[in-house]
A protein has these predicted regions:
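Intracellular juxtamembrane helix-capping segments at the cytosolic ends
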Residues: 27, 114-127, 322-335
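C-terminal transmembrane bundle of multi-pass solute transporters/carriers
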Residues: 42-48, 54-65, 69-71, 75-81, ...
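Cytoplasmic helix-loop-helix junction between adjacent transmembrane helices
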Residues: 105-145
Protein backbone atom coordinates (compact mmCIF):
# COMPACT_ATOMS: atom_id res chain seq x y z
CA UNK A 1 0.00 0.00 0.00
CA UNK A 2 2.93 2.38 0.69
CA UNK A 3 4.72 1.46 -2.54
CA UNK A 4 5.70 4.45 -4.68
CA UNK A 5 4.51 2.68 -7.82
CA UNK A 6 1.11 1.79 -6.32
CA UNK A 7 0.77 5.46 -5.34
CA UNK A 8 1.51 6.50 -8.93
CA UNK A 9 -1.05 3.95 -10.13
CA UNK A 10 -3.95 5.21 -8.03
CA UNK A 11 -3.05 8.88 -8.49
CA UNK A 12 -2.79 8.42 -12.25
CA UNK A 13 -6.10 6.57 -12.24
CA UNK A 14 -7.71 9.31 -10.13
CA UNK A 15 -6.85 12.00 -12.70
CA UNK A 16 -7.84 9.69 -15.57
CA UNK A 17 -11.21 8.85 -13.98
CA UNK A 18 -11.99 12.49 -13.22
CA UNK A 19 -11.02 13.35 -16.78
CA UNK A 20 -13.28 10.59 -18.12
CA UNK A 21 -16.29 12.02 -16.25
CA UNK A 22 -15.65 15.61 -17.37
CA UNK A 23 -15.06 14.35 -20.93
CA UNK A 24 -18.55 12.79 -20.99
CA UNK A 25 -20.11 15.90 -19.41
CA UNK A 26 -18.42 18.14 -21.98
CA UNK A 27 -19.44 15.93 -24.91
CA UNK A 28 -23.07 15.80 -23.75
CA UNK A 29 -23.09 19.60 -23.64
CA UNK A 30 -21.48 19.93 -27.09
CA UNK A 31 -23.64 17.30 -28.82
CA UNK A 32 -26.89 18.56 -27.35
CA UNK A 33 -26.07 22.16 -28.30
CA UNK A 34 -25.23 21.04 -31.85
CA UNK A 35 -28.10 18.61 -32.51
CA UNK A 36 -30.65 18.83 -29.65
CA UNK A 37 -31.33 15.14 -30.25
CA UNK A 38 -31.65 12.30 -27.74
CA UNK A 39 -30.42 9.90 -30.45
CA UNK A 40 -27.01 11.58 -30.66
CA UNK A 41 -26.72 11.55 -26.87
CA UNK A 42 -27.62 7.83 -26.86
CA UNK A 43 -24.70 7.23 -29.22
CA UNK A 44 -22.30 8.10 -26.38
CA UNK A 45 -22.95 5.01 -24.19
CA UNK A 46 -23.32 2.85 -27.32
CA UNK A 47 -19.91 3.84 -28.72
CA UNK A 48 -18.30 3.64 -25.28
CA UNK A 49 -19.64 0.15 -24.62
CA UNK A 50 -18.64 -1.42 -27.92
CA UNK A 51 -15.36 0.49 -28.15
CA UNK A 52 -14.34 -0.99 -24.79
CA UNK A 53 -15.54 -4.41 -25.92
CA UNK A 54 -13.28 -4.26 -29.00
CA UNK A 55 -10.33 -2.98 -26.95
CA UNK A 56 -10.73 -5.72 -24.35
CA UNK A 57 -11.02 -8.34 -27.08
CA UNK A 58 -7.73 -7.34 -28.75
CA UNK A 59 -5.81 -6.59 -25.53
CA UNK A 60 -4.28 -10.14 -25.26
CA UNK A 61 -2.51 -9.70 -28.62
CA UNK A 62 -0.74 -6.61 -27.28
CA UNK A 63 -0.11 -8.26 -23.92
CA UNK A 64 2.14 -10.89 -25.52
CA UNK A 65 4.25 -8.15 -27.12
CA UNK A 66 4.47 -5.35 -24.53
CA UNK A 67 4.81 -4.99 -20.77
CA UNK A 68 1.67 -4.34 -18.73
CA UNK A 69 2.96 -0.97 -17.50
CA UNK A 70 3.74 0.07 -21.10
CA UNK A 71 0.20 -0.80 -22.18
CA UNK A 72 -1.39 1.15 -19.32
CA UNK A 73 0.78 4.23 -19.89
CA UNK A 74 0.45 3.90 -23.68
CA UNK A 75 -3.33 3.71 -23.44
CA UNK A 76 -3.48 6.93 -21.43
CA UNK A 77 -0.98 8.73 -23.69
CA UNK A 78 -2.85 7.74 -26.86
CA UNK A 79 -6.15 8.81 -25.26
CA UNK A 80 -4.57 12.21 -24.61
CA UNK A 81 -3.47 12.53 -28.25
CA UNK A 82 -6.90 11.53 -29.60
CA UNK A 83 -8.58 13.95 -27.19
CA UNK A 84 -6.34 16.76 -28.49
CA UNK A 85 -7.41 15.93 -32.06
CA UNK A 86 -11.04 15.99 -30.89
CA UNK A 87 -10.51 19.44 -29.33
CA UNK A 88 -9.02 20.78 -32.57
CA UNK A 89 -12.02 19.49 -34.55
CA UNK A 90 -14.53 20.98 -32.10
CA UNK A 91 -12.66 24.31 -32.12
CA UNK A 92 -12.26 24.81 -35.86
CA UNK A 93 -15.05 22.87 -37.59
CA UNK A 94 -18.85 23.37 -37.74
CA UNK A 95 -20.51 21.76 -34.68
CA UNK A 96 -23.19 20.19 -36.89
CA UNK A 97 -20.65 17.73 -38.39
CA UNK A 98 -20.47 15.11 -35.64
CA UNK A 99 -19.15 11.93 -37.28
CA UNK A 100 -15.46 12.78 -36.55
CA UNK A 101 -16.48 13.31 -32.91
CA UNK A 102 -18.03 9.82 -32.87
CA UNK A 103 -14.84 8.32 -34.34
CA UNK A 104 -12.74 9.94 -31.58
CA UNK A 105 -15.21 8.73 -28.92
CA UNK A 106 -14.92 5.16 -30.19
CA UNK A 107 -11.10 5.27 -30.33
CA UNK A 108 -10.88 6.61 -26.75
CA UNK A 109 -13.27 3.88 -25.58
CA UNK A 110 -11.17 1.29 -27.46
CA UNK A 111 -8.06 2.49 -25.59
CA UNK A 112 -10.02 2.30 -22.31
CA UNK A 113 -10.53 -1.36 -23.16
CA UNK A 114 -6.78 -1.80 -22.59
CA UNK A 115 -6.59 0.35 -19.46
CA UNK A 116 -9.23 -1.40 -17.33
CA UNK A 117 -7.73 -4.94 -17.39
CA UNK A 118 -4.18 -3.55 -17.12
CA UNK A 119 -5.11 -1.50 -14.04
CA UNK A 120 -6.74 -4.45 -12.24
CA UNK A 121 -3.92 -6.83 -13.14
CA UNK A 122 -1.23 -4.43 -11.86
CA UNK A 123 -2.64 -4.10 -8.34
CA UNK A 124 -1.46 -7.55 -7.09
CA UNK A 125 1.96 -6.89 -8.65
CA UNK A 126 2.45 -3.63 -6.74
CA UNK A 127 1.13 -4.59 -3.28
CA UNK A 128 1.68 -7.52 -0.94
CA UNK A 129 -0.78 -10.42 -1.10
CA UNK A 130 -2.07 -9.78 2.44
CA UNK A 131 -2.88 -6.18 1.45
CA UNK A 132 -5.03 -7.06 -1.57
CA UNK A 133 -8.44 -6.50 0.05
CA UNK A 134 -7.25 -3.18 1.47
CA UNK A 135 -5.69 -2.12 -1.86
CA UNK A 136 -8.80 -3.04 -3.88
CA UNK A 137 -10.99 -1.22 -1.33
CA UNK A 138 -8.80 1.87 -1.55
CA UNK A 139 -8.88 1.89 -5.36
CA UNK A 140 -12.68 1.44 -5.28
CA UNK A 141 -13.12 4.38 -2.88
CA UNK A 142 -10.93 6.58 -5.09
CA UNK A 143 -12.96 5.59 -8.16
CA UNK A 144 -16.37 6.22 -6.55
CA UNK A 145 -15.20 9.52 -5.05
CA UNK A 146 -14.09 10.80 -8.45
CA UNK A 147 -17.34 9.57 -10.02
CA UNK A 148 -19.56 11.26 -7.44
CA UNK A 149 -17.48 14.42 -7.22
CA UNK A 150 -16.81 14.49 -10.95
CA UNK A 151 -20.47 14.46 -11.99
CA UNK A 152 -21.36 17.13 -9.42
CA UNK A 153 -18.34 19.26 -10.44
CA UNK A 154 -19.09 18.66 -14.13
CA UNK A 155 -22.70 19.76 -13.71
CA UNK A 156 -21.48 22.99 -12.09
CA UNK A 157 -18.96 23.58 -14.90
CA UNK A 158 -21.64 23.23 -17.61
CA UNK A 159 -23.53 26.13 -16.02
CA UNK A 160 -20.43 28.35 -16.08
CA UNK A 161 -18.43 27.22 -19.14
CA UNK A 162 -18.99 25.93 -22.66
CA UNK A 163 -18.50 22.21 -23.32
CA UNK A 164 -15.31 22.94 -25.27
CA UNK A 165 -13.66 24.45 -22.17
CA UNK A 166 -14.58 21.36 -20.13
CA UNK A 167 -12.89 19.17 -22.76
CA UNK A 168 -9.76 21.33 -22.43
CA UNK A 169 -9.78 20.69 -18.67
CA UNK A 170 -10.09 16.97 -19.42
CA UNK A 171 -7.01 17.25 -21.65
CA UNK A 172 -4.99 18.75 -18.77
CA UNK A 173 -6.10 15.94 -16.44
CA UNK A 174 -5.18 13.33 -19.07
CA UNK A 175 -1.70 14.85 -19.46
CA UNK A 176 -1.11 14.67 -15.67
CA UNK A 177 -2.39 11.08 -15.62
CA UNK A 178 -0.11 10.11 -18.53
CA UNK A 179 2.96 11.50 -16.74
CA UNK A 180 2.14 9.50 -13.60
CA UNK A 181 1.41 6.30 -15.52
CA UNK A 182 4.78 6.58 -17.27
CA UNK A 183 6.48 6.52 -13.86
CA UNK A 184 5.05 3.14 -12.81
CA UNK A 185 7.62 0.32 -12.71
CA UNK A 186 6.57 -3.32 -12.35
CA UNK A 187 9.44 -5.19 -10.70
CA UNK A 188 7.63 -8.54 -10.60
CA UNK A 189 9.67 -11.46 -11.88
CA UNK A 190 7.52 -13.40 -14.34
CA UNK A 191 7.95 -16.64 -16.21
CA UNK A 192 9.23 -16.49 -19.77
CA UNK A 193 6.52 -15.98 -22.36
CA UNK A 194 5.32 -19.04 -24.17
CA UNK A 195 6.11 -19.63 -27.81
CA UNK A 196 4.23 -17.56 -30.33
CA UNK A 197 0.81 -18.64 -31.49
CA UNK A 198 -1.79 -17.28 -33.88
CA UNK A 199 -3.68 -14.08 -33.10
CA UNK A 200 -6.95 -16.00 -32.84
CA UNK A 201 -5.41 -18.26 -30.18
CA UNK A 202 -4.08 -15.21 -28.33
CA UNK A 203 -7.57 -13.65 -28.26
CA UNK A 204 -9.10 -16.91 -27.01
CA UNK A 205 -6.49 -17.44 -24.29
CA UNK A 206 -8.18 -15.43 -21.53
CA UNK A 207 -11.58 -16.92 -22.34
CA UNK A 208 -10.15 -20.44 -22.13
CA UNK A 209 -8.41 -19.66 -18.82
CA UNK A 210 -11.82 -18.72 -17.41
CA UNK A 211 -13.72 -21.63 -18.96
CA UNK A 212 -11.21 -24.38 -18.11
CA UNK A 213 -11.01 -23.50 -14.41
CA UNK A 214 -14.15 -24.52 -12.50
CA UNK A 215 -14.02 -21.78 -9.90
CA UNK A 216 -13.21 -19.03 -12.42
CA UNK A 217 -16.02 -20.26 -14.66
CA UNK A 218 -18.47 -20.16 -11.75
CA UNK A 219 -17.41 -16.65 -10.74
CA UNK A 220 -17.85 -15.36 -14.29
CA UNK A 221 -21.28 -16.93 -14.67
CA UNK A 222 -22.24 -14.88 -11.60
CA UNK A 223 -20.57 -11.78 -13.11
CA UNK A 224 -22.63 -12.19 -16.32
CA UNK A 225 -25.92 -12.46 -14.39
CA UNK A 226 -25.09 -9.49 -12.18
CA UNK A 227 -23.89 -7.36 -15.10
CA UNK A 228 -27.21 -7.99 -16.86
CA UNK A 229 -29.09 -6.98 -13.69
CA UNK A 230 -26.99 -3.83 -13.16
CA UNK A 231 -28.42 -2.32 -16.35
CA UNK A 232 -31.49 -1.17 -14.37
CA UNK A 233 -29.41 1.64 -12.84
CA UNK A 234 -28.68 3.40 -16.15
CA UNK A 235 -30.14 6.87 -16.54
CA UNK A 236 -32.64 5.96 -19.27
CA UNK A 237 -34.45 3.40 -17.06
CA UNK A 238 -34.17 5.40 -13.83
CA UNK A 239 -35.68 8.47 -15.53
CA UNK A 240 -38.76 6.45 -16.45
CA UNK A 241 -39.00 4.91 -12.96
CA UNK A 242 -38.74 8.30 -11.25
CA UNK A 243 -41.48 9.74 -13.45
CA UNK A 244 -43.93 6.82 -13.68
CA UNK A 245 -43.53 5.07 -10.29
CA UNK A 246 -42.23 7.65 -7.81
CA UNK A 247 -44.20 10.48 -9.50
CA UNK A 248 -41.56 13.14 -8.90
CA UNK A 249 -39.58 15.33 -11.28
CA UNK A 250 -36.62 14.00 -13.23
CA UNK A 251 -34.32 15.97 -10.89
CA UNK A 252 -34.90 13.23 -8.29
CA UNK A 253 -32.78 10.96 -10.51
CA UNK A 254 -29.81 13.00 -9.33
CA UNK A 255 -30.61 12.17 -5.70
CA UNK A 256 -30.86 8.46 -6.54
CA UNK A 257 -27.52 8.63 -8.34
CA UNK A 258 -25.92 10.42 -5.38
CA UNK A 259 -27.38 7.88 -2.91
CA UNK A 260 -26.04 4.96 -4.97
CA UNK A 261 -22.53 6.41 -5.23
CA UNK A 262 -22.58 7.28 -1.51
CA UNK A 263 -23.41 3.63 -0.79
CA UNK A 264 -20.56 2.50 -3.06
CA UNK A 265 -18.12 4.79 -1.24
CA UNK A 266 -19.34 3.59 2.17
CA UNK A 267 -18.91 -0.04 1.05
CA UNK A 268 -15.36 0.65 -0.06
CA UNK A 269 -14.51 2.39 3.22
CA UNK A 270 -16.02 -0.50 5.19
CA UNK A 271 -13.85 -3.01 3.29
CA UNK A 272 -10.82 -0.78 3.85
CA UNK A 273 -11.49 -0.65 7.60
CA UNK A 274 -12.29 -4.35 8.10
CA UNK A 275 -10.06 -5.85 5.38
CA UNK A 276 -8.49 -8.54 7.58
CA UNK A 277 -11.82 -9.75 8.96
CA UNK A 278 -13.42 -9.80 5.49
CA UNK A 279 -10.57 -11.81 3.99
CA UNK A 280 -11.21 -14.56 6.54
CA UNK A 281 -14.95 -14.77 5.80
CA UNK A 282 -15.18 -13.99 2.08
CA UNK A 283 -17.55 -16.81 1.15
CA UNK A 284 -20.13 -16.01 3.83
CA UNK A 285 -19.98 -12.28 3.14
CA UNK A 286 -20.24 -12.48 -0.65
CA UNK A 287 -23.22 -14.87 -0.51
CA UNK A 288 -24.99 -12.74 2.13
CA UNK A 289 -24.53 -9.48 0.23
CA UNK A 290 -25.64 -11.11 -3.05
CA UNK A 291 -28.90 -12.19 -1.43
CA UNK A 292 -29.24 -8.71 0.08
CA UNK A 293 -28.79 -6.97 -3.29
CA UNK A 294 -31.47 -9.19 -4.84
CA UNK A 295 -33.97 -8.32 -2.08
CA UNK A 296 -33.15 -4.59 -2.29
CA UNK A 297 -33.61 -4.50 -6.07
CA UNK A 298 -37.01 -6.24 -6.01
CA UNK A 299 -38.12 -4.05 -3.09
CA UNK A 300 -37.01 -0.93 -4.99
CA UNK A 301 -39.09 -1.99 -8.00
CA UNK A 302 -42.22 -2.50 -5.87
CA UNK A 303 -41.75 0.66 -3.79
CA UNK A 304 -43.31 4.04 -4.63
CA UNK A 305 -42.19 6.09 -1.59
CA UNK A 306 -39.32 8.44 -2.39
CA UNK A 307 -37.37 8.38 0.91
CA UNK A 308 -37.53 4.58 1.06
CA UNK A 309 -36.23 4.47 -2.53
CA UNK A 310 -33.17 6.53 -1.51
CA UNK A 311 -32.43 4.24 1.45
CA UNK A 312 -32.78 1.11 -0.71
CA UNK A 313 -30.48 2.55 -3.37
CA UNK A 314 -27.83 3.50 -0.79
CA UNK A 315 -27.91 0.01 0.75
CA UNK A 316 -27.73 -1.56 -2.72
CA UNK A 317 -24.64 0.52 -3.50
CA UNK A 318 -23.02 -0.47 -0.20
CA UNK A 319 -23.61 -4.19 -0.73
CA UNK A 320 -22.62 -4.00 -4.41
CA UNK A 321 -19.25 -2.49 -3.55
CA UNK A 322 -18.49 -5.12 -0.89
CA UNK A 323 -19.32 -7.88 -3.37
CA UNK A 324 -17.20 -6.35 -6.17
CA UNK A 325 -14.15 -6.01 -3.93
CA UNK A 326 -14.39 -9.59 -2.65
CA UNK A 327 -14.84 -11.11 -6.12
CA UNK A 328 -12.02 -8.97 -7.52
CA UNK A 329 -9.71 -10.02 -4.68
CA UNK A 330 -10.64 -13.68 -5.21
CA UNK A 331 -9.71 -13.50 -8.89
CA UNK A 332 -6.41 -11.74 -8.11
CA UNK A 333 -5.60 -14.34 -5.46
CA UNK A 334 -6.42 -17.43 -7.49
CA UNK A 335 -4.93 -16.51 -10.88
CA UNK A 336 -1.22 -16.42 -11.60
CA UNK A 337 0.30 -12.99 -12.31
CA UNK A 338 1.00 -14.07 -15.92
CA UNK A 339 -2.62 -15.10 -16.55
CA UNK A 340 -4.37 -12.31 -14.67
CA UNK A 341 -4.24 -9.64 -17.45
CA UNK A 342 -5.67 -12.15 -19.96
CA UNK A 343 -8.49 -13.07 -17.58
CA UNK A 344 -9.33 -9.42 -16.94
CA UNK A 345 -9.22 -8.70 -20.66
CA UNK A 346 -11.80 -11.40 -21.39
CA UNK A 347 -13.85 -10.33 -18.36
CA UNK A 348 -14.06 -6.67 -19.40
CA UNK A 349 -14.94 -7.59 -22.99
CA UNK A 350 -17.67 -9.91 -21.67
CA UNK A 351 -19.07 -7.25 -19.31
CA UNK A 352 -19.18 -4.64 -22.10
CA UNK A 353 -21.00 -7.01 -24.46
CA UNK A 354 -23.57 -8.19 -21.88
CA UNK A 355 -24.19 -4.65 -20.66
CA UNK A 356 -24.75 -3.31 -24.18
CA UNK A 357 -27.20 -6.09 -25.08
CA UNK A 358 -29.21 -5.86 -21.85
CA UNK A 359 -29.50 -2.07 -22.07
CA UNK A 360 -31.52 -2.60 -25.25
CA UNK A 361 -33.52 -5.51 -23.79
CA UNK A 362 -34.44 -3.82 -20.51
CA UNK A 363 -35.15 -0.57 -22.35
CA UNK A 364 -37.70 -2.40 -24.51
CA UNK A 365 -39.31 -4.02 -21.44
CA UNK A 366 -39.57 -0.62 -19.72
CA UNK A 367 -41.12 0.86 -22.87
CA UNK A 368 -43.63 -1.86 -23.77
CA UNK A 369 -44.35 -3.72 -20.50
CA UNK A 370 -43.57 -1.90 -17.25
CA UNK A 371 -40.54 -0.28 -15.69
CA UNK A 372 -41.42 -2.08 -12.42
CA UNK A 373 -41.01 -5.40 -14.22
CA UNK A 374 -37.48 -4.36 -15.21
CA UNK A 375 -36.43 -4.06 -11.55
CA UNK A 376 -38.30 -7.22 -10.53
CA UNK A 377 -36.64 -9.12 -13.40
CA UNK A 378 -33.23 -7.76 -12.37
CA UNK A 379 -33.92 -8.84 -8.79
CA UNK A 380 -34.67 -12.39 -9.91
CA UNK A 381 -31.47 -12.47 -11.99
CA UNK A 382 -29.58 -11.44 -8.86
CA UNK A 383 -31.40 -14.14 -6.85
CA UNK A 384 -30.32 -16.77 -9.40
CA UNK A 385 -26.73 -15.46 -9.13
CA UNK A 386 -26.87 -15.65 -5.32
CA UNK A 387 -28.25 -19.20 -5.41
CA UNK A 388 -25.60 -20.27 -7.92
CA UNK A 389 -22.89 -18.66 -5.78
CA UNK A 390 -24.13 -20.50 -2.68
CA UNK A 391 -23.44 -23.80 -4.43
CA UNK A 392 -20.32 -22.97 -6.43
CA UNK A 393 -18.35 -20.25 -4.62
CA UNK A 394 -15.18 -21.84 -3.15
CA UNK A 395 -15.07 -22.33 0.61
CA UNK A 396 -11.42 -21.24 0.85
CA UNK A 397 -8.61 -19.67 -1.15
CA UNK A 398 -5.68 -21.63 -2.44
CA UNK A 399 -2.36 -20.76 -0.87
CA UNK A 400 0.94 -20.89 -2.67
CA UNK A 401 0.81 -22.33 -6.17
CA UNK A 402 -1.45 -20.64 -8.72
CA UNK A 403 -4.39 -22.63 -10.08
CA UNK A 404 -3.22 -22.55 -13.67
CA UNK A 405 -0.43 -24.66 -14.99
Amino acid sequence: MKSKHFRLLWLGQLFANLGDVLYIVGLISILYAAKESAFYLAMLPFLNTFGRFAGGLLFPILLNRYRLTSLLAGSQCYKTVVLFILILWISFQPPSIVWPIFICIWIIAFLDGWAAPAMNALVPRLVKREELVKANSFVAVIYETTQLGGWAFGGLLTVIFHGEHIIWLTFVLFVISSIMMKGIVDETSLKAKRKKCGKRDEIKEGWLLIWNNRFMRSIHIVIVLETAASVVWVAAILYVFVSEVLHVTEAFWGYINAAFFTGLMAGGLCCLKFAFCMERHMRKIVISVSIGISIMTIWFGLNSITWIALILVAFSGFLEQVKRIIINTYIQTEASLEDLPKIYSAQHALISLIFGLFVLMFGAIAEYVSVKMVFIGAGFLLAIAALYMTVHFPAHFKKGAPPYS
